[in-house]
Amino acid sequence: VMNSKPGLYKHVLVVDFKSLYPSIMRTFKIDPLGLVEGLISPEEAIEGYRGAKFSRDKHFLPDIITSLWQQRDAAKKNQDAARSQAIKILMNSFYGVLGSGGCPFYDTRLASSITMRGHDIMQTTAKWIEEAGYQVIYGDTDSIFVWLDAELSNLQASEIGESLACEINQKWQDNILQAHQLDCDLEIEFETH
């Protein structure tokens, strides 16, 4: 979460990461089995947080989330809003259960590797937006509010929002491939103006 910049603003874009926590789990292979295997063979592992290391190929949750993601996309395509919402809740519950002391797989390194990575992703994204010449006025868990300090038509503002989302997505693809040798499942979307 970012501090807000109080004021009245015109032409504010909202960009939002699509299912941020599940996409972090998919991208960085965050998973209980992956944690155990990553600690056994740390030289090939993906760095997590608080000492966590995750196996690049021995895991199960990222694959389950990928399957659910595809089912959700199909539900959206078929305009099945109830099914899409149910799958979204199910995918997000994977993070919740890993952060619950009652879960047999509970390990603070799992939940921390999701939330702390999410925080870093949001901070980096805000920095990139500001480097592109726009002002970030607020951010929460997975959304960033961007002020376009100019007189624009709704169409112009929407075009900037779409372009900004494409630019950020490409930056994340490049960044994660270069830094971690991983495919990126993060996707930011222009939500509204």
How does the language model describe each region?
Residues 1-193:
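Conserved acidic
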